[in-house]
Amino acid sequence: MKTFSAKAHEVKRDWLLVDADGKILGRFATQIASRLRGKHKPEYTPHTDTGDYIVIINASKIKVTGNKFEDKMYHHHTGYVGNLKSIAFKDLQAKKPEEIINKVVKGMLPKGPLGRDMFRKMKVFAGSEHTHGAQQPQVLDI
């Protein structure tokens, strides 16, 4: 008997709708990353993108434990000398709440072309409205 290896064009991908309201950021992101990779499917193949499309709503209502709401900082470098920029979690949540989930989930996916393809299948929205109604996403409770 041969080992099964899924082909990317043969994989059936579902559209899932996930509500982030009141969820804890890290625990929520691990579930999303696992679904994006396709690890919940029996035909999971590590070198092939077998994951589902995921639409996340209410990103602005995500929670963190402990003092991270006040203390957690996100850093990025502009590329110029001495330009390391920092922003606090609470400020980033007020300005761009989608970016928080994007950063966390992207860090949990494989690095390289395969991980970038997986990341593109995640759509994050700050409010409860989304633009993917035509895909008829199924509600997933995490």
From Swiss-Prot:
The keyword Ribosomal protein is assigned to this record: yes
Keyword Transferase attributed: no
Gene3D superfamilies registered for this protein in UniProt: Ribosomal protein L13
PROSITE patterns in the record: RIBOSOMAL_L13 (PS00783)
Pfam family, one: Ribosomal_L13
Molecular function, one GO term: mRNA binding
Keywords for the protein's UniProt record, in alphabetical order: Ribonucleoprotein, Ribosomal protein
A biological process from GO: negative regulation of translation
InterPro entries in the cross-refs: Ribosomal_uL13 (IPR005822), Ribosomal_uL13_bac-type (IPR005823), Ribosomal_uL13_CS (IPR023563), Ribosomal_uL13_sf (IPR036899)
Gene Ontology cellular-component terms listed: cytosolic large ribosomal subunit
PANTHER family to which the protein is assigned, alphabetical: LARGE RIBOSOMAL SUBUNIT PROTEIN UL13M, RIBOSOMAL PROTEIN L13
Assembly: Part of the 50S ribosomal subunit.
Function (record text): This protein is one of the early assembly proteins of the 50S ribosomal subunit, although it is not seen to bind rRNA by itself. It is important during the early stages of 50S assembly.
Family as reported in the entry's similarity comment: Belongs to the universal ribosomal protein uL13 family.
Protein name per its UniProtKB record: Large ribosomal subunit protein uL13
Organism: Ruthia magnifica subsp. Calyptogena magnifica
